Amino acid sequence: MAKPDNQNQMVMEKTESYHNGNKALIELRKVVKVYKSAAGDYKALKDIDIEVGAGEFVAVIGKSGSGKSTLINMITGIDRPTSGEVLVGDTAVHKLSEDGMAKWRGRNLGIVFQFFQLLPTLSVAENIMLPMDFCNLYSLKEREERAINLLKIVELDDQAHKLPAALSGGQQQRVAIARALANDPPVVIADEPTGNLDSKMADAVFSLFENLVSKGKTVVMVTHDSSLAKRASRTILLADGEVVNEYVAKALPALTPQQMIKVSHSLELITYPPGSSILQEGSTSDKFYIISQGRVEVALQRTGASDIVVAHFSPGQYFGEIELMRGGKTRATIKATPEMPVEVLALERERFLELLSESEETKNTIDQIVKARLQENATGRRVD
C-alpha cells in the first residue's frame, strides 16, 4: 500500500508563491456564487477575497444565511464558484475534475461536519480507517495502528471496537475529528462542529482543534458560538455574502455587520513609507483612519522641549477622530514607525459623522476614547 506522497501533499512552510501565484496556503479570489431557481438568481457569495496562511486557526462567523457554509463548500470543492478562483496550496480547486477532486480532497483535507456521519454498521476504528482505504494509503496493519493512535489523541481509544451508537454525541464528534485526520492532511475544515453539543463537549472539541494548530495544522472552522470564535487566531465575519473588513470589525465592534459592510465600501486604502508623517500637528484633517498594517507613533510638541512620543497604535486601532468630533487643528503628529510601511483605511468626514448618527453606541465609545486621549495629550505636554 502507498504511503503519503509528500510531493502530492501541500507544503506547510512556504517562502515563495505556490504554483498558481498564491502566497497564502488558502486563497479565494473574487469568488462569486449564484444559485439559480424559478424564483430568480440568489447571490450567496459576492466577490469574496480571503487569505488563510499555513498554521492559522480561522473562525468563520456570521448570521444564518450569511454565506458561511457556502464559503466552506468552495474551499472543500463540495460546490463550485460561479466565477473566481479557489486556490489551496499548489492546487486550483475550482479547475479539478470530479475524480481529481475526490483524490485531492482525500489526501489534503480533513473535513468535519455538524452531523457526525459515522457509518453505523462499522466500528469506531473502522470508521477512521475509511479515508485510508479510499486513498489506498498504508498497509492494513498500519491503518489499524493509525486508527488507534488517532483515537488516543481524542481520548477514545478504549471505544475503538464499539459501534457509533454506543457513544455520546460529543464522543462521536471527536471520532469524526479523528477520521478527518486519518490521512494526515495539512488542512482541517469544520462546518459547525460544535453545533449540536453542550458547552462542555463543545469546549473539549474546540480544544482538540487548538491542539492541532499547535502541531502545525491549518484549521478553518464555521461556528455560531462567538465565545469559541474568540479563541481562534483570527475571525472572518460574513454578512449578506460579503466579508466584513477585519480591521473595521476590530475598530468599530458596536456596528452591525451590515453597517460594517457599508463602511468598508467607503474606505480608501492609503500606504505610507516607513517614518513618514500621516498627520502633522497643527494641520487640518478631514479623515478618520483605521490601521490595517504596520504601526504608527503619536508625537506631541512641547514648549521649550523636544517632541515626545506618547503612544503607538497597531492594526485595528484608529486615529483622527478627535478633530472630526471636536473640530480644530490636529492635536498631535502621527507618523509611520521607522521599521515598516503603514497601511490605513481612510473614511471621509461626512461618512464618519453619518456613521456616528447611525450607531449611538459607537458614538459614545469613540467619545470616551476622545476624552481619554485629550487627557493623555495634556499630561504628555507637561515639561518637568
Predicted segments with their positions:
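Conserved catalytic segment of ABC-fold P-loop ATPases
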Residues: 231-237
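Cyclic nucleotide-binding regulatory module and flanking cytosolic helices
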Residues: 239-276, 314, 356-378, 382-383
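Cyclic-nucleotide recognition modules
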Residues: 310-368
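Regulatory nucleotide-sensing modules
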Residues: 250-309, 315-317
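ABC-family P-loop ATPase nucleotide-binding domain
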Residues: 1-34
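Post-Walker A (P-loop) alpha1-beta2 connector of ABC-family nucleotide-binding domains
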Residues: 78-80, 236, 289
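Conserved coupling/switch loops of ABC nucleotide-binding domains, chiefly the family-specific signature
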Residues: 82-85, 240, 286-287, 293
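ABC family nucleotide-binding domain
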Residues: 24-221, 226-229
